Amino acid sequence: EIGAIQPLPELAAICRDQGVSLHSDAAQAFGHIPLDSQRLGADFLSLSAHKLNGPKGIGALIYNPDLEVEPLQWGGGQERGLRPGTLPVPLIIGFAKAAELALSDLASRSQRLKGLRNQLWEGLKQRQPTLLLNGHATARLPHNLNITIPGVSGSKLHRALRSRVACSSGSACSRGEPSHVLMA
């Protein structure tokens, strides 16, 4: 939500020591920073195509093959028996192409986006010194800038900026409630 890069290998080690599986929502990270599921140590990583400019409605779950995973729905043998239903082939192909494009120039694009993000942050901070950066200053995704502007209504600011800037005043799944991440 705020672009913070968590110390997954360390968290995974703690979980393993306690006999707990670890899931990480890697949708924001996939295609923007290197992701090696084995090095990260998470038992489950979820990905989403639309975060890569791919089609909406398709994602992937990478999971540790050593774990026994029980299906939530029963039916056909699709997706290794974990989820029944007809596979959405056009969405799968769109996801694969979006991933291929994102991964083909990941390092250079990440560096460029990081530079643009930092330039935007510095420019905003010079004009409005009371701005607050949400999350870690450096351990963050290159394409995400999450800020708080004290005393300014997020919805009013969003309405004023939305025709010129890709922005939001909350998460897509927030239902108008303040973010529990930002409130913590």
Each PLM stretch: what is its role?
Residues E1-A184:
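Pyridoxal 5′-phosphate
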